[in-house]
């Protein structure tokens, strides 16, 4: 279709697709930020192997978590809900991005800083989960898997891992006005601020 912005053109296709149902056929990924219950089990079964489905509509996702999991055993599913695994929530980003940015007096929050947050979260998800996180969420052994692709919001490691990544990215990208020199001391101060020392 004509008159698409450059941002939308990046995701456009020349394929003849008129419906969400058609778009889901052989798709590897679905990212929904729309309304509840627009994705059906048949849409999920038409997707490629090991599909990634981020059904992020709140309060109810594009497809119910249990229905999706019952439909596809190979699915990697995330929602914005705290009562299901893989809750994607901005609480994992904003406080820690701002903390790192403020601590180096960054003049702006740029793409390098946002990507540093993404990478730090991804790396943290692959690390062994502290017992206190398992207890807080009523779990026995959280570990990187289809049901745990992103850290939990109450993971105390977030404060010591995400802000330093943001601060370092701000410094490396030239937007930090007060660089950090002692990273160990900085991490220790972050832990003390949060009561996790």
Question: Residue locations for each model-derived region?
Answer:
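Short acidic, glycine/serine/threonine-rich loops at helix termini
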Residues: 1-4, 42-44, 64-68, 89
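Glycine-rich phosphate/diphosphate-binding loop of Rossmann-like nucleotide-binding domains
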Residues: 1-35
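N-terminal Rossmann-like NAD(P) cofactor-binding subdomain of oxidoreductases
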Residues: 12, 33-36, 46-49, 56-63
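A short, aliphatic-rich alpha-helical micro-motif
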Residues: 23-24, 44-47
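Adenosine-phosphate binding glycine-rich loop
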Residues: 55-163, 167-180
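Long, charged amphipathic helices and adjacent flexible linkers at domain junctions
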Residues: 180-197
């Amino acid at each position: 279709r004509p008159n698409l912005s450059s941002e939308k053109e990046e995701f456009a296709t020349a394929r003849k697709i008129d419906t969400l149902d058609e778009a889901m056929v052989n798709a590897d990924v679905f990212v929904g930020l729309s309304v509840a219950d627009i994705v059906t089990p048949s849409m999920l079964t038409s997707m490629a192997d090991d599909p990634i489905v981020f059904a992020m509509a709140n309060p109810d996702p594009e497809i119910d978590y249990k229905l999706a999991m019952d439909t596809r055993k190979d699915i990697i599913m995330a929602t914005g809900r705290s009562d299901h695994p893989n809750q994607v929530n901005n609480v994992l980003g904003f406080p820690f991005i701002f903390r790192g940015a403020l601590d180096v007096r960054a003049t702006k929050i740029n793409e390098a800083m946002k990507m540093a947050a993404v990478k730090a979260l991804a790396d943290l998800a692959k690390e062994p989960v502290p017992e206190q996180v398992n207890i807080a969420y009523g779990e026995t052994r959280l570990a990187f898997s289809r049901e745990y692709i992103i850290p939990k919001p109450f993971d105390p490691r977030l404060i010591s891992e995400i802000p330093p990544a943001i601060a370092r990215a701000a410094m490396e990208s030239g937007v930090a006005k007060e660089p950090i020199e002692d990273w160990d001391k900085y991490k220790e101060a972050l832990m003390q601020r949060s009561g996790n020392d």
